[in-house]
Amino acid sequence: RAKFKIQEGIVRGFREFLYKEGFTEIHTPKIGAKGAEGGSNLFRLDYFHRPAVLEQSPQLYKQMMVGVFDRVFETAPVFRAEKHNTKRHLNEYTSLDFEMGYIDSFEDIMAMETGFLQYTMELLKKDYAKELKILDVTLPDVSKIPAIRFDEAKQKVSEKYGRKIRNPFDLEPEEEHLIGQYAKEEWDSDFVFVTYYPSKKR
């Protein structure tokens, strides 16, 4: 029961914060003709004798609706047909998506994400303290989230943890883990933004 209440609190925090920031909630189709973005395999199905897929992202619809509302968000399931044997992947999950128009830089997005986390953590402390105690959960400090450039992050991990850089254009799972470890040791933060990710991997 407590886990479901915490899940409720996170989604509630997401909605409440974005409403306060002038966002409009949208509801997009989950059955489509094609995928919205590359890099993910699709669950394919027969839709009344026509090929269709389960959507792996609302990206296309979000970008369309930004032209109407400027700021939009959605809380909904997404589906990714990727075979895996790790704790890092899910074939179905609830995605918290938002899209903004007319921003000055990616730092505007980072500020919005930081604001959401700060708002939601305070909401959980205030309204879900009982559930947090049952689960023996200590919420992370999100008063400030550090940022590090992609190339600098790769270099720091290589120097501090003796890991050879094998792929200069992407982060390997172990590197992601070590960047998180570096952020905790260097800034005492459980979160970190990695900026200036190579555009060829986007």
Where are these regions (language model features)?
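A generic alpha-helix structural signal
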Residues: R15, M110-E113, K154
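Short, mixed-charge, low-aromatic patches
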Residues: V66-A76, A111, I134, V192, ...
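Hydrophobic alpha-helical scaffolding
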Residues: F4, A52, M65, E99-M110, ...
